[in-house]
């Protein structure tokens, strides 16, 4: 039987992979978005694990809201990146630092 600590260890590993990915690769925006999504998956895993082991469905319902916000975040982020690539020809972080508002 899988225990709560197994889920927490898995979630911690996924969270750390996301953090390391953000700190190591700061040049590609798509990779940064993927690492943020890994962090959100780790948080969702914690919510589902605690919800299951405590016998409460609130954590699982909260995961649906997080997934909805994450999907909207990715859609808007990719739309911005598409426009940035069309206008600048690159999606590097260095290009976004030169944007004027």
From Swiss-Prot:
GO terms for cellular component: NADH dehydrogenase complex; plasma membrane. One of its GO terms (molecular function) is NADH:ubiquinone reductase (non-electrogenic) activity. It is found in: Cell inner membrane. Keywords: Cell inner membrane, Cell membrane, Membrane, NAD, Quinone, Translocase, Transmembrane, Transmembrane helix, Transport, Ubiquinone. It is a multi-pass membrane protein. Its EC number is 7.1.1.-. It catalyses: a quinone + NADH + 5 H(+)(in) = a quinol + NAD(+) + 4 H(+)(out). GO terms for biological process: ATP synthesis coupled electron transport. It holds the Pfam family Oxidored_q2. It comes from the Bacteria. The chain crosses the membrane at residues 4-24, 29-49, 61-81. It is an enzyme of class 7 (translocase). PANTHER family: NADH DEHYDROGENASE SUBUNIT 4L-RELATED (PTHR11434:SF21), NADH-UBIQUINONE OXIDOREDUCTASE SUBUNIT ND4L (PTHR11434). HAMAP family: NDH1_NuoK. NDH-1 shuttles electrons from NADH, via FMN and iron-sulfur (Fe-S) centers, to quinones in the respiratory chain. The immediate electron acceptor for the enzyme in this species is believed to be ubiquinone. Couples the redox reaction to proton translocation (for every two electrons transferred, four hydrogen ions are translocated across the cytoplasmic membrane), and thus conserves the redox energy in a proton gradient. NDH-1 is composed of 14 different subunits. Subunits NuoA, H, J, K, L, M, N constitute the membrane sector of the complex. Belongs to the complex I subunit 4L family. This is NADH-quinone oxidoreductase subunit K. The gene is nuoK.
């Amino acid at each position: 039987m899988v225990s709560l600590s197994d889920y927490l260890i898995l979630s911690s590993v996924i969270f750390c992979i996301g953090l390391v990915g953000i700190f190591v690769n700061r040049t590609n925006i798509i990779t940064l978005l993927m690492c943020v999504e890994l962090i959100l998956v780790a948080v969702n895993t914690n919510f589902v694990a605690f919800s299951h082991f405590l016998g409460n469905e609130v954590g699982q319902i909260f995961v649906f809201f997080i997934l909805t916000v994450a999907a909207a975040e990715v859609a808007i982020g990719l739309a911005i990146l598409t426009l940035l690539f069309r206008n600048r020809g690159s999606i590097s972080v260095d290009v976004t630092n030169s944007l004027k508002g």
